[in-house]
Amino acid sequence: LPLSNMISLPDEEREVFYRDWRILAQDYLLIGKINQEPGSQLVQVQYEFFDVNREIKLAGEVLTGSVTQLRDIGHTISNVVFEQVTRVPGAFTSQLLYIVSEEAGPGLSLFKLEKSDYDGARPQVLLESGEPIMSPSWSPNGQDVAYVSFETGLPRIYIQNIASGQRRQITNYPNTNSSPVWSPDGNKLAMV
């Protein structure tokens, strides 16, 4: 809804007039404000989410973090709003693992294992190799990733810690070592 069409601009519950939003054919209303003390890197984000037709507040809280965490705070709020409307948990704080293949010269490729936000923002390279990388799989605790690398000339499965970058080869079978998948408790890997 364009700002110019809004009848009122509430930033807290006592300023919400449901009739204004019904006139504008809006089913839901999300309002909020960000407070930051001068000279501080901390912000407080206060939001409230309303069902206009039922005239009730569905959710609201104050989230605190650094200025650099505003995107994450926004995604957290998006998860709450999405779940309130759909009854399905939001995925806005999810991260992706994927492989990027780039041309590195005539007949050469560079393969990168990357992670990013669910929308591709904030990509981070976890591994670069001149040999193919495939089948990345998150550990259930989100701290490690298993993947297949051909850096030895043969497919081998590695586990790498996301934070430290430490990695270790865990397979050396003579044939195929592929498609690692973590057990729900994160203590075992299934593979082909």
What is each residue range found by the language model?
Residues 88-92, 140-141, 184-185:
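Residue-level detector of Asp-centered blade-edge/turn motifs that repeat once per structural unit
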Residues 96, 142-146, 186-190:
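Hydrophobic beta-strand positions that form the internal "hydrophobic ladder"
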Residues 2-9, 117-134, 160-178:
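Multi-bladed beta-propeller domains
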Residues 1-43:
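Short, solvent-exposed, polar/charged sequence segments at loop or secondary-structure edges
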Residues 89, 101-112, 128-131, 148-157, ...:
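A flexible loop/linker signature enriched in serine peptidases of the S9 family
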Residues 53-125:
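C-terminal/domain-edge helix-coil "capping" segments
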